Swiss-Prot record:
InterPro entries: Cystine-knot_cytokine, IL-17_fam. The gene is IL25. Disulfide bonds join 110-168, 115-170. This is Interleukin-25. Gene3D superfamilies: Cystine-knot cytokines. GO terms for cellular component: extracellular region; extracellular space. Its main location: secreted.
Length: 177
């Protein structure tokens, strides 16, 4: 028979849930501008070069953490950023493409295959799996514009959706059968 969570544990879960929701609302609410012209002036003009350097996605701080090679050593920190305190801790990896706007996107990578126990903060609980949470981010890819007689006149911005992993979440395992 399972014990009911104590008031302190329950409020910790609610607090963690609210922090994750706030983080996701912040990141998902920062879409790129969709009203840019489809073809920009030539590369020599300042405005196009400024656009290529401008990123509309908030840049999370890079963590020095590396993926845990030993799953039994997965831990949830007591302080620090949300990604290290979560019961499904993650780190960020840079994805840079110089022909994409924004050029820099950060992808979450789960540090543990299972969730960290809320009771100990250090041992993994096999009743929960750490899985990535994704968002489709609007990005623009730079493509050459064709001028008169096949000459290149600047470049065009091609709008696409790009799948970005935002965070890791603790989920119940799927039951096949």
């Amino acid at each position: 028979m399972r014990e009911r969570p104590r008031l302190g544990e329950d409020s910790s879960l609610i607090s963690l849930f609210l922090q994750v929701v706030a983080f996701l609302a912040m990141v998902m609410g920062t879409h790129t501008y969709s009203h840019w012209p489809s073809c920009c002036p030539s590369k020599g003009q300042d405005t196009s070069e400024e656009l290529l350097r401008w990123s509309t996605v908030p840049v999370p701080p890079l963590e020095p953490a590396r993926p845990n090679r030993h799953p039994e050593s997965c831990r949830a920190s007591e302080d620090g950023p949300l990604n290290s305190r979560a019961i499904s801790p993650w780190r960020y990896e840079l994805d840079r493409d110089l022909n994409r706007l924004p050029q820099d996107l950060y992808h979450a990578r789960c540090l543990c295959p299972h969730c960290v126990s809320l009771q100990t903060g250090s041992h993994m609980d096999p009743r929960g799996n750490s899985e990535l949470l994704y968002h489709n981010q609007t990005v623009f890819y730079r493509r050459p514009c064709h001028g008169e007689k096949g000459t290149h006149k600047g470049y065009c911005l091609e709008r696409r959706l790009y799948r970005v992993s935002l965070a890791c979440v603790c989920v119940r395992p799927r039951v096949m059968g």
